[in-house]
Amino acid sequence: MAASPVPGGGGAGAVHSSNAAGFTFDSGLEIRTRSVEQTLLPLVSQITTLINHKDNTKKSDKTLQAIQRVGQAVNLAVGRFVKVGEAIANENWDLKEEINIACIEAKQAGETIASLTDVTKRSHLESDGQVTILTDKTGVVQAARLLLSSVTKVLLLADRVVIKQIVTSRNKILATMERLEKVNSFQEFVQIFSQFGNEMVEFAHLTGDRQNDLKDEKKKARMAVARAVLEKGTMMLLTASKTCLRHPSCESAHTNKEGVFDRMRVALEKVTEIVTDCRLSGETDSSSVSIFTGIKELKVNIEALRENVCFESKENLSAALEAVLEHVEDFTDSAYTSHEHRERILELSSQARTELQQLLSVWMQTQSRKTKSAAEELELTVLKISHSLDELRRELHCTAMQLAADLLKFHADHVVLKALKVTGVEGNLEALAEYACKLSEQKEQLVETCRLLRHISGTEPLEITCIHAEETFQVTGQQIISAAETLTLHPSSKIAKENLDVFCEAWESQMSDMATLLREISDVFEGRRGERCDHLSLPKPTKNSANLKSLKPDKPDSEEQAKIAKLGLKLGLLSSDADCEIEKWEDEENEIVRHGRNMSRMAYSLYLFTRGEGPLKTSQDLIHFLEVFAAEGLKLTSSVQSFSKQLKDDDKLMLLLEINKLIPLCHQLQTITKTSLQSKVFLKVDKCITKIRSMMTLVVQLLSLCYKLLKKMENNRWGSATNKDTMDGQN
């Protein structure tokens, strides 16, 4: 930030390293941004060097000179810092007095440290009684504490200037929005909207910088969500306002417009809340503790029993479990949860209750017996309930993920949105009512699914993303219906049609974002977050050097882009399906599982490519990707063939038939990599994605079939062993 007097560096918690040196500063000065923390780090490092010198060792001239250089460096850095602080004070009269006081304190502390470290005149130390770092280390500690405290105050006051800029920018936008809301002519609207656009750009830059600077990941996620609403809302505000101006007496057009303005105002207030770190009066947290967090905290308290660190009362532990199980009812009460999942969840919930009571009973007995056997029994009961809670969490995860994946797959073609567009242009009010009802049903399904996903998301930022998705589906669903109603009432209106298109695109975009969210939740659950594109770190082949150009030539038109996006979404859904199948396997190191997981991750990378995201950028990247994917497919077929040798003839034949479908597709994909992608790029990319989609469909089927056959084989072995034991017993 502008107020930094010394180079930045370091990471979180750097400031607190000073405590180890025996000094602290004002604990009320909470540091919330990386820039402030990193600005302080070099100063902390220099002061720590001074404080940590050994008191009773003889100092060489070289050591004394080094101490003096550090002291002078600190004083010079503080001097530069004070000049910057004073300049900021002169530009911000409301903070001038506070900044100047802190600058004076910092300057005095810097001069004190410079004086105390002036120890090169060793011959005068004893004769004139000069006080130095060698004779008054306490004075240095006090000066260091004052210096860090005053410098931190200046930095935080300067940070308030940044906050003030964001709030001022927000206020300008709100004022312009009020003018936009009241405008009555197109000409006036265009002029004001141009100003609004410039203000939004400035606000986006300020909030983007702030988002990157925040230390708290939860706040960063909330800021990202609010900024996304504002970014997408700007286009919605434009088309909704134009529609209102064109059809001023249309009630649905006004409803549509009001929805956009309301949501943007809420997003602006959320930004203010985040940067000022205060919740608006009367506002409460929109979310309760998720099931994932509840189980995590409960397990920590249970582990404390094992270590005998503390004893949570029976009532407290039972209440904590009941709070978790109360949220579990969101799953069991949902009309979209399958009977099989519901029964399993209820069974695991009952099991957790029983095992907690058993644990509490065993713990009480352990306190009186204090024997090895009692300790072992306690250990066993702790392991049992921990396992039950993990199983419950896994079942909830599978339930929510499967529901979400099925829902995205079912609505991948956006049939209802297309029907609403057609009925609008036709002016068919009866059909509008029918499809509006269908969209409302779809919206309710998606909203409930997002609520369930929040419970199992695994991190606070992902929880916030789930809440955002829920709110977006809730609001956008209503706005699509009002926009469709406006078009149906005015079927020849180009502006009304454009407005409906914008809201439908926002819905489709959120559906696509939800597919990404599923993958991120899955990554967190399996502990493989950030490994999505690990195959791209493999050595890149040097052949096909003629294809090193970017994939920019022959830019596809909007229809081609839409087709690619649709194929990509289906590929993303297949990747989620594969993950769901993989989750069923207990042996994560199984060769079939390993190759299936690799192919799933790579398919997801290609899905990101269709959105213009991810690491796949050039034809070289894509060729390498296709080669690795085809090779991974052949490795999977090889592993499945090895597994088939353990099966009976009928099962073996069934599995080999599926393998024989996948092998030719792998070879065809290898053939594609040997041809240039530079000409007719769209057609070849389309062909590649279609081929990989077919392969992933077979991979999902193979994973499912192999799992079923594996379980069948294990059950047969267990049955044979049981029969043998029975026969042996009879003999």
UniProtKB/Swiss-Prot annotation:
Subcellular location, record wording: Cytoplasm, Cytoskeleton; Cell membrane
Disordered, as annotated region: 535-559
Keywords assigned: Cell membrane, Cytoplasm, Cytoskeleton, Membrane, Phosphoprotein
Residues annotated with Phosphoserine modification: 373, 537
MF annotations from Gene Ontology: actin filament binding; cadherin binding
Record carries keyword Lipid biosynthesis: no
UniProt membrane topology term: Peripheral membrane protein
Principal localisation: cytoplasm
Keyword Transcription regulation: no
Any GO BP: Rho protein signal transduction
One GO cellular component term noted in the UniProt record for this chain: plasma membrane
Quaternary assembly: Interacts with ARHGEF1. Interacts with Dtna. The interaction is required for correct localization of both Ctnnal1 and Dtna.
Similarity-based family: Belongs to the vinculin/alpha-catenin family.
UniProt function note: May modulate the Rho pathway signaling by providing a scaffold for the Lbc Rho guanine nucleotide exchange factor (ARHGEF1).
PANTHER family in the record: ALPHA-CATULIN (PTHR46342:SF1)
Protein name: Alpha-catulin
Provenance organism: Mus musculus (Mouse)
